[in-house]
Amino acid sequence: MAGRLLLLLLCAALPDELRAEGGVFIKKESADKFLERTKRANSFLEEMKQGNIERECNEERCSKEEAREAFEDNEKTEEFWNIYVDGDQCSSNPCHYGGQCKDGLGSYTCSCLDGYQGKNCEFVIPKYCKINNGDCEQFCSIKKSVQKDVVCSCTSGYELAEDGKQCVSKVKYPCGKVLMKRIKRSVILPTNSNTNATSDQDVPSTNGSILEEVFTTTTESPTPPPRNGSSITDPNVDTRIVGGDECRPGECPWQAVLINEKGEEFCGGTILNEDFILTAAHCINQSKEIKVVVGEVDREKEEHSETTHTAEKIFVHSKYIAETYDNDIALIKLKEPIQFSEYVVPACLPQADFANEVLMNQKSGMVSGFGREFEAGRLSKRLKVLEVPYVDRSTCKQSTNFAITENMFCAGYETEQKDACQGDSGGPHVTRYKDTYFVTGIVSWGEGCARKGKYGVYTKLSRFLRWVRTVMRQK
């Protein structure tokens, strides 16, 4: 029965051949042609050709090996095979915050951008202030929340930009900005003068103790104190700056100069705002009358940028120790406010953490003044500025026999002839961060000027920021 059915099918499929031959049988060539099976596999010549993914896998189901032959690249084969087997797991864009998705067999992998983590990059990695200052241009703090996000803020005269990171000025002459390129620094040491004591005035300090406005009589320039607390008589051991470059108008706009009753310059200072000048406590006893000049860059020339101001009140830190120069800091309240310009601008006050963790971890700071051009030399006619590297604390302590307290730090060069010198005392030590200059220290004391193996010693402002801000509120 099956044979008859097959015969009928053959007859139906080949009516022309049957009629042509007039019988049941057909020629061998025709029969072979009809019964020949078409192979799916490549012919010999096709096997010699490079694989084709369309031919190998899209026309019919293929194996991974056939796909590899088509791509001739393991990585591309894996990418294709993962989608070919079970579809593209990345088609739904599962990776958040710009993460890149890579398909797998029954799964996917997200490569997250910096700052994000999780299977789908869905979690924001909290930034910390110790890492690149939290990307803040100025101050950085950690928000007290579950994720502990970074919060940026700005010093006085600035406000946060829309990005929450940058600080933009909201005043005409913002602190810490130099409108012209700057040159290096120099330092001055107060000259000897007789002074008379005046009345004291008390104001509350941050710790509840009494802050005194004090003038004491002295006939000597300040010298660094020995470790045993007694004074030393070496006339070459003085407070100071040496070997800087000239500071042109507007390049050191926060520089202030203290003038005695004879019209002589004896110390430096830093402009903090229109009412207050920061200086060293040991400068205060150098004259019974103090005036402050700002905007000056040449002692023998009228630049028409300088103005002179009278000291109304003087605040010396209540814990200042003259024998050791500890807590060597004072503030001068001016009777007439300073008018700011492109030549006269205050330096910025930092926050303590910002000063300690960011500013003082910079390579160097800047000091400026009209100090002596070399040890026992004459005072500089021109304002000078000098870059001074921060010095490791242990190196600083090992370089001197005098006490280096927690309220001091060292800066300068071990062998180069560059340093602060006599007459620069009380002057500014500022540090630049993202084109803004912040006060980091006060020129305090040193052993000679630019001596080999010796460094300049500065009052560490971050230890006194609360005190400074408390006094500046005493208007």
From Swiss-Prot:
Residues 21-40, 186-240 form a propeptide. Its EC number is 3.4.21.6. Residues 241-473 form the Peptidase S1 domain. One of its GO terms (biological process) is proteolysis. Residues 41-85 form the Gla domain. Residues 216-237 are annotated as: Disordered. It comes from the Eukaryota. The active site is at H282 (charge relay system), D328 (charge relay system), S425 (charge relay system). Residues 86-122, 125-168 form the EGF-like domain. It is an enzyme of class 3 (hydrolase). Belongs to the peptidase S1 family. This is Coagulation factor X. It comes from Gallus gallus. The lineage of its organism: Eukaryota, Metazoa, Chordata, Craniata, Vertebrata. The gene is F10.
